[in-house]
Amino acid sequence: MEIAAVSTVSVAPQSRRVSNAFSRNLGSVSSLSFGFFEKEYCFKSPSLRVSAAASMDAVTAEKFSPASFLDKKETGVLHFVKYHGLGNDFILVDNRDSSEPKITQEQAAKLCDRNFGVGADGVIFAMPGVNGTDYAMRIFNSDGSEPEMCGNGVRCFARFIAELENLQGKHSFTIHTGAGLIVPEIQDDGQVKVDMGTPILKAQDVPTKLSGNKGEAVVEAELVVDGVSWNVTCVSMGNPHCITFGKKGGPNLKVDDLNLPEIGPKFEHHEMFPARTNTEFVEVLSRSHLKMRVWERGAGATLACGTGACALVVAAVLEGRADRKCTVDLPGGPLEIEWKQEDNHIYMTGPAEAVFYGSALL
């Protein structure tokens, strides 16, 4: 596999900027314009070749506009744009011409490798809509597995569609995901507000083998991990989440003290979670301010998890620890989460930003 990536670097101040929304967004990262490659840095491994272009002349910027770049039809070449939502980063692929992903799960895992690939938490495919939706979204995690959906990924997806369609200002889309219908709305300030639907609390639908102790829901139940009892609440946002505020009978968590790589996999692969689970470790700062670290199923420790932030607010409300509208601090930054009582829907608001675009020879 060979990868060519355009990096975000400064150019001379007299250079003319590209006028579309994509370049303006990248301009917030650095003074980037696209054009001729003056330098090329290459790295080779037995399985792929990575090259990054730097210091470019903007005179021919139009040749590297998002539309023209992603519309290229080259056999054996995958064009992509990398985005991130609070550091949760994804490779976005324009797959609107096919209902099958353009790469395999094995190829996606190679692309996501942070040492020998592009580096990402997952690959997201923008696909034709189904069942009357505008678009469909599929994701391959960095380990090649396929989750039902991803909250931060949905925000990146929405911004990606806006760039592809050259949409300006406020817009909303209907997206079919493995977790059902999701409706993101790009705000005037560029933030993305997403209607994440309703939480699933029935134990067998999360799924978890833990017995429901609050009706059919699992709330503050005991989960024994390596001989230690934790209080957990189980919530599905279309994908499974196990939320804990601390050990049974112990003080509230201080999440910065956790050895996440050690404890995270033990929750993910616990026998009580037949489909594995995402795990949120939560510290309560106030009734409207929560702090979390996450171990994601199939991706490990990440800087942010949108569905996890939604799930933990549900858990915090069910356990009486927080109100329905909260700021959730993640390692990559804050998300605004609201679980509305009127319709039982959860709304997530946060950023999504383009990083760079590139190509991979498959």
UniProtKB/Swiss-Prot annotation:
Q: Recall the GO molecular function terms of this protein's record.
A: diaminopimelate epimerase activity
Residue numbers annotated as active site:
C150, C305
Q: How is its activity regulated?
A: Inhibited by aziridino-diaminopimelate (AziDAP).
Taken from the UniProt entry, a GO cellular component term is: chloroplast
This protein's pathway reads: Amino-acid biosynthesis; L-lysine biosynthesis via DAP pathway; DL-2,6-diaminopimelate from LL-2,6-diaminopimelate: step 1/1
Q: Which reaction does it catalyse?
A: (2S,6S)-2,6-diaminopimelate = meso-2,6-diaminopimelate
Q: Which UniProt keywords apply?
A: Acetylation, Amino-acid biosynthesis, Chloroplast, Isomerase, Lysine biosynthesis, Plastid, Transit peptide
Relate the protein's function as given in its record.
Answer: Racemase that operates by a 'two-base' mechanism, which involves one active-site cysteine acting as a base to abstract the alpha-proton of an amino acid, while a second cysteine thiol functions as an acid to reprotonate the resulting planar carbanionic intermediate from the opposite face.
What family does this chain come from, according to its entry? Answer: Belongs to the diaminopimelate epimerase family.
Listed name of the protein: Diaminopimelate epimerase, chloroplastic
- Say which species the protein is native to: Arabidopsis thaliana
Native organism taxonomy = Eukaryota, Viridiplantae, Streptophyta, Embryophyta, Tracheophyta
